[in-house]
Amino acid sequence: MKLLLPKAYISQAAADVRKATARVNLISMVIADHDETHELIAEIEAAALRGVTVTVSADVFTYGEVSGSFLPIKYYSKNAKLATHMAKKLRAAGVKFSWLGRARLTIFNGRTHSKWCVVDDTVYTFGGVNMYEKGVDNVDYMFRQVNKRLADRLVYEQGRITKAERTTTNYPSVAYELDDETVLIDGGIITQSVIYRRACELALEAKSVIFVSQYCPTGKLARILKRRDTKFYFNRPEMADTINAMVLRLNTLLSRIKTHYKRNVYLHAKFIIFTMEDGSKVAITGSHNFAYTGVLFGTREIALETKDPNVISQLESFYETYIA
């Protein structure tokens, strides 16, 4: 697996889609045709026009994000209309495009945070990059690998999500082995998160921890990490928009945790590196913020639990270069 920064992810994925012969599957919380993402969006449209099976799923939260609002209700702003136009254009080209989360009880419940791009048997996932201008500018990454088994599974999972949306339902979290690693998928059931549970279990075993996320940890995980030698990195409230700033202030107040993050670029990467008593290391990397709020509201997520030295060394290098 290779860690790619957001711009490299867009460029490499576009090049792969250009050569796609069978399938392209893209899912993200936010998808918009901005200058920073246009190369990939254009290649996705072209792939559908030449007969490749293309499926794209985006959360309706897109409308809020592109309109400069936390709430996904500005469907008629200029930028929101552009998002609607993008969806119509992709559908006209033959893309199976769907908006996720339209019928949820609240703006938080049932949100789809999962992110992946499957091109034939090439997979981009286990990172947090949203497919729009700000998403590309954030401190973030995606991992790229060629793995047919993973590609097949993610195409299947996207189908499950689409089916669940038709009846406004969710499905249980699942963990499954992938070679020597474990893929963790949260299906959106309220209070159920295999990703959060594994983070708590690993934290209990760890001697020291590097915690990186958009938000401060909350709940059981926060309590465990405070008892360990943990370096916490998450955004300062003044770096965020109004609602996110309120969330950060409230979470830090409740958890009584201070961030070590001193840089000025918005942090959106999400991973934890656990160092065990014997010196071995385990990492979780993906879309989950590791805040219990998301667990309570039932967000859909994906993450990888890994002991692979190559993956962990790439995360450590990313940490040293862009976060510490």
Task: Walk through the language-model features, giving the residues of each.
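Charged, low-complexity intrinsically disordered terminal segments
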Residues: 1-96, 102-324
